[in-house]
Amino acid sequence: MVCALVCEDLARPDPVANIVRAVGPNLVIALLMDGPQTKERWAARYATVLADDPGCSVLSLTSLGMAQLSSPKAPPSRSRVVALWKDRFNGATEIEVPPGAVAIAVSLSTRYDEEFTADGRGDGGKAAFPILSGMHPITAAARAQTR
């Protein structure tokens, strides 16, 4: 199950976090109008909470244009980090649009793991969790070829 959040839903965890925990989605996608999605910023902290409890995968993303509006006081510029992926198995992964590319596509795979009920019954490893399996830059030349 996928749960979509917009900027304010992620920024203000109450009451949204309670609803997300009650639903228990496998994947949360947070669409943000924000700066670069680096591990140090606020979105990463809130995404980590959702990835840990209820244990879903979280993708927070912003547009390349919004990320490039960022003007950090000290180098290096991280203005091409447009997304952050976090799941229950791996640490946070910054997703950056490389120079020369206009976008980036992500590939997801499914990892199966066992979950248990409150009384100790397992599901036999049938619980599916999306995990990040690849990042693929899209260049303007590749985009022109598809038209």
Labelled PLM ranges:
Residues 7-122:
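CN hydrolase (nitrilase-like) catalytic-core segments centered on the catalytic cysteine
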Residues 103-147:
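A short C-terminal boundary segment appended to hydrolase-like catalytic domains
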Residues 2-3:
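A structural signal for the main folded, soluble domain(s) of proteins
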